[in-house]
Curated annotation (Swiss-Prot):
Subunit structure: Interacts with the Ste20-like MAP kinase msn.
Entries under Gene3D superfamilies matching the protein: Tumor necrosis factor alpha-induced protein 8-like (1.20.1440.160)
Misc: The name 'sigmar' is an abbreviation for salivary glands marred which describes the mutant phenotype.
Stored PANTHER family: PROTEIN SALIVARY GLANDS MARRED (PTHR12757:SF1), TUMOR NECROSIS FACTOR INDUCED PROTEIN (PTHR12757)
Record's protein name: Protein salivary glands marred
Effects seen without this gene: Viable and develops to adulthood. However, pupal salivary glands are abnormal with large empty vacuole-like structures, tubulin disorganization, and reduced autophagy flux. Salivary glands appear normal up to the wandering larval stage, but then exhibit a slight increase in overall length until in pupae 23 hours after puparium formation, salivary glands are significantly longer and wider. Salivary gland histolysis occurs but appears to be delayed.
Length: 188
C-alpha cells in the first residue's frame, strides 16, 4: 500500500534530474562546473573527436558525462544516498583517483604504459560507481555510465593515447594538466 502513496519529494527529485539532464550541454554545464573541470571536459571532447572522427559521438559522450555528474550531484544534494552507499562512494573515489594517477604516470613516464592494469582500473571504477547509483538511476542512465567507461577503456584508444609518438600527445598533455589541477583543488 505504501508504494501507492503520492510523494511530492520523490516527484520533485525526479523532475530535477530530468530537467538538469535535458540541460546538459557543454555551455550549460560551464555555469555549474568550474574552469578546470570545464577545460578537462573540452579536452576529453577533443580526444573523443580525434579518436572517433565523429563530432556527434564525441558530443554525446561528453553530454553523458555531464548528465551523470549532474544526476549524482542532485542525488547527493538531496541526501538520497544511504550510509552504505556513501561508504561505496569513498571506495569509488579511491579507485577513480588511482585511475587518474595511473593516467598521469603513464603519460609522463614513457614506456610505463600497462594496458591490462589501466583497463582493470577503469572497469573497477565503473563497477564501483554503478554499485552506488544503481538503485537511484534508470537503466538509460546506467547505460550512459557503461558507454562512457567502455569508451575510455577501449584498447585502441588507450594504446594510441599513451604511445610516446601518439597523435593525441598534445591533447593528452592538456588532459593530464587538467587532471593534476583538478586533483590539487579537490574538484575530482
Amino acid at each position: 500500500m505504501a508504494d501507492n502513496v503520492f510523494k511530492s519529494h520523490d516527484i520533485g527529485l525526479r523532475a530535477q534530474k530530468k530537467i538538469l539532464s535535458r540541460m546538459a550541454t557543454k555551455n550549460i554545464a560551464k555555469t555549474f562546473i568550474d574552469g578546470t573541470t570545464a577545460s578537462l571536459l573540452d579536452n576529453l571532447y577533443r580526444l573523443c573527436k580525434m579518436h572517433t572522427g565523429n563530432k556527434a559521438k564525441a558530443e554525446k559522450l561528453i553530454k553523458n558525462i555531464i548528465k551523470i555528474v549532474i544526476k549524482i550531484g542532485v542525488l547527493h544534494r538531496n541526501n538520497q544516498f544511504s550510509d552504505e552507499e556513501l561508504q561505496k562512494a569513498e571506495l569509488f573515489k579511491r579507485k577513480f583517483q588511482n585511475t587518474q594517477l595511473s593516467i598521469i604516470s603513464f603519460y609522463e613516464v614513457d614506456f610505463t604504459f600497462d594496458l591490462p592494469y589501466l583497463q582493470k582500473s577503469i572497469a573497477e571504477s565503473q563497477v564501483a560507481l554503478k554499485s552506488i547509483v544503481q538503485p537511484h538511476l534508470t537503466e538509460k542512465s546506467l547505460g550512459r555510465i557503461d558507454e562512457v567507461f567502455d569508451f575510455f577503456g577501449e584498447e585502441a584508444l588507450l594504446e594510441t593515447a599513451f604511445r610516446p609518438d601518439s597523435p593525441y600527445r598534445e591533447v593528452m598533455g592538456k588532459i593530464v594538466a587538467d587532471i593534476n589541477a583538478a586533483m590539487e583543488t579537490g574538484d575530482i
